[in-house]
């Protein structure tokens, strides 16, 4: 209790920095990581969590996800993927949309397309939006799996709520072209143009409405 009161009045960061050197317990590493975070020192925040992970001390989902997010932020997607994958393997991390999506994206960013594929597939099935099927289609396309890529993109378009519907039609056209489905490819490219024109018209109208409100 006394130490808790002192923590409110003192900068305890140096104390924890000494503690982890002599008594490298999980609670000291995680608290040190949190203190670095409060002081806007994300690299040190990551380093403290990484040290705890390397010593096998992390055992909660939020700890694995926090470390993987920091690693990804500092452009180390492969280690981010390995950390999160380890959490899945140890049954520490639940298979839910956000965790499956994160692992898929980390493997994707690491150019490990075959490893990203099953996690995009699981996440896409759970998601209420079609975006993850588009990512799955990109992965299949990158692996020259044109038929699977085509089906994934179609599922994404069907599910809808896409950030870039025109881009999805463009990608589908490319896949169909590579699969020598010429007529279908042309239809997709035309659909891409139609959707892009509609999106531009909507955007232009919104801008006009904003300008009118300013006047």
Question: What function would you assign to each model-found segment?
Answer:
Residues 1-215:
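Alpha-solenoid helical repeat scaffolds
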């Amino acid at each position: 209790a006394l130490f808790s009161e002192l923590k409110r009045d003192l900068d305890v960061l140096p104390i924890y920095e000494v503690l982890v050197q002599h008594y490298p317990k999980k609670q000291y590493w995680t608290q040190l990581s949190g203190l670095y975070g409060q002081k806007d020192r994300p690299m040190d925040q990551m380093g403290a969590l990484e040290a705890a992970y390397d010593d096998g001390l992390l055992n909660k989902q939020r700890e694995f996800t926090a470390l993987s997010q920091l690693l990804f932020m500092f452009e180390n997607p492969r280690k981010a993927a390995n950390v999160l994958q380890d959490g899945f393997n140890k049954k520490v991390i639940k298979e839910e949309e956000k965790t499956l999506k994160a692992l898929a994206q980390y493997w994707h960013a690491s150019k490990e397309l075959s490893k990203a594929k099953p996690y995009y597939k699981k996440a896409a099935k759970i998601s209420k939006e079609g975006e993850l099927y588009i990512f799955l289609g990109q992965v299949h396309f990158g692996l020259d799996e044109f038929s699977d890529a085509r089906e994934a993109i179609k599922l994404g378009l069907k599910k809808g709520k896409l950030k870039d519907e025109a881009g999805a039609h463009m990608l589908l056209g490319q896949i169909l072209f590579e699969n020598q489905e010429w007529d279908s490819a042309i239809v997709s490219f035309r659909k891409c143009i139609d959707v892009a024109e509609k999106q531009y018209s909507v955007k232009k109208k919104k801008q006009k409405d904003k300008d009118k409100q300013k006047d």
